[in-house]
């Protein structure tokens, strides 16, 4: 079981390294890792488990955050509009197309690897198409928008050694780009 102790923090060199492609089919070790990542997110969102194991709630996690330079990520959150969970375990994800239109979270973004709040607006593509593989080796193309697109871009950034705060305008952190859409 993964805990907060397994998550490396801002300043660790792995967070700034480009992660490597993962060979398919997945090794037993890689399969265990991506399944543990999903379990962590589920437990972090469960009030009782989160309190018991002192987990910070997360909606996404990438293998580099666990000090594995591998192109794997997991997204898991409850989508109120759909009335269901959005869950993706992705191997070697690539953004193959995106909208011109940008979106952002008005409250800013956070990260399991960054302990302190970093105020500022992070602009992301409003819609993206991601090509990736499932843990079973099946190729998938996901069309994501709104919160799903923001979370996916945040996690894919981790695979490329980019932190969310790298996108914040240093001169005017709360500046919203013209025509950018707020995602509530």
UniProtKB/Swiss-Prot annotation:
Annotated GO MF terms: metal ion binding; peptide deformylase activity
- Protein name according to UniProt: Peptide deformylase
List the catalytic activities from the record.
N-terminal N-formyl-L-methionyl-[peptide] + H2O = N-terminal L-methionyl-[peptide] + formate
In the Enzyme Commission scheme, what number(s) does this protein have?
3.5.1.88
What is the similarity comment for this entry? Belongs to the polypeptide deformylase family.
Name the InterPro entries for this protein: Peptide_deformylase, Peptide_deformylase_sf
Q: Which residues form the active site?
A: 155
Name of the gene encoding the protein in the UniProt record: def
Q: Which cofactor is recorded for it?
A: Fe(2+)
Tell me if Metal-binding is a UniProt keyword of this record. yes
Provide the alphabetized UniProt keywords: Hydrolase, Iron, Metal-binding, Protein biosynthesis
Q: Which Pfam families match?
A: Pep_deformylase
Task: Say which domain of life the source belongs to.
Answer: Bacteria
Which positions bind Fe cation? 111, 154, 158
Q: What does this protein do?
A: Removes the formyl group from the N-terminal Met of newly synthesized proteins. Requires at least a dipeptide for an efficient rate of reaction. N-terminal L-methionine is a prerequisite for activity but the enzyme has broad specificity at other positions.
């Amino acid at each position: 079981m993964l805990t907060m102790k397994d998550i490396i923090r801002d300043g660790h060199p792995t967070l700034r390294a480009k992660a490597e492609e993962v060979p398919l089919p997945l090794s037993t070790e890689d399969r265990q890792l991506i399944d543990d990542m999903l379990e962590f997110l589920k437990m972090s969102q469960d009030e009782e488990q989160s309190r018991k194991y002192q987990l910070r709630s997360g909606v996404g996690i990438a293998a580099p955050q666990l000090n594995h330079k591998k192109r794997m990520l997991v997204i898991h959150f409850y989508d109120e509009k759909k009335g269901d969970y959005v869950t993706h375990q992705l191997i070697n994800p690539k953004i193959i197309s995106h909208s011109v239109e940008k979106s952002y979270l008005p409250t800013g973004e956070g990260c399991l690897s960054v302990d302190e709040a970093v105020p500022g607006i992070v602009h992301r593509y409003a819609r993206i198409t991601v090509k990736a593989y499932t843990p079973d080796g099946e190729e998938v193309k996901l069309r994501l928008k709104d919160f799903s697109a923001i979370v996916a871009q945040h996690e894919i950034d981790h695979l490329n050694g980019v932190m969310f705060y790298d996108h914040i305008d240093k001169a005017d952190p709360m500046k919203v780009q013209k025509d950018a859409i707020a995602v509530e």
